[in-house]
């Protein structure tokens, strides 16, 4: 008997589940956010802007998702590594399109493989992070 092969790419259906879970969590918290899902190469796969979310969150959600996918780390962790005196100091300046604060999570198998990333923006960094974690957990 063959074991099913693991998916090596992020499907639109998977991305839509992430978006739905993020929206549900944002609504539960009574927040309006933007949610972006990118593939392993950081290309946008799905995006939603909830009613009343701030316009600045559009770009930030995508940047957080991109950061998580490209570095296979939560964007907040990348931020800690990018601080003064840290190994990735000023990575945002040398590698454009990143956001090095909480709200982005890699999608995949717990560090084994990265299928993409989800990014949430529009609330506090901690709230964005909790919504992104809900998206990953339900995806």
Could you say what each language-model-derived stretch is?
Residues 1-139:
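Flexible, solvent-exposed loop/hinge segments and secondary-structure transition points
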